[in-house]
Amino acid sequence: MAIGVPRPLAIEKPQAVDLVQAARYFGAHGEPDAATLALLQKCAVPLLAVAMPQAVWLLADTPALTEAGLLPGEDVHKHLTGCGQAILLAVTLGPGVDAQIRRAGVGDIAAGVASDALGSALAEQAADAAEAQLDRKS
């Protein structure tokens, strides 16, 4: 098989951003305080509005991935020890999210950092949804 053909994977936009996860990315330990939660809630609305999650995946023989230079570093090799094949998954929220993060940070550094944390949480949610789709396919 070597390296398979990339295939698109339809994923839906989450209804909301996981604010607790976003708060962790923002640097909060434990439950976020009211001010942090309010900032995240405020910044989540425009970020979610522009998000357009998309995913692509492929199945490949792990030796072919190594030969192609797609698995740099030793840690990934340790994780894949004994695996003949691996699924590679890529997820994006689209360019609108990056633009919104930049807009939010103009004149308000905290809003920019909060938006970045929200984008990370939303990307993780999209990746989880894509992984669930792949699980249903197998």
At which residue positions do the language-model features occur?
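Compact, glycine/acidic-enriched structural inserts
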Residues: A110-A132
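Active-site helix-to-loop segments that bind/position phosphate- or nucleotide-bearing substrates
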Residues: M1-S115
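Conserved small/polar residues in nucleotide/adenosyl-binding loops
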Residues: S138
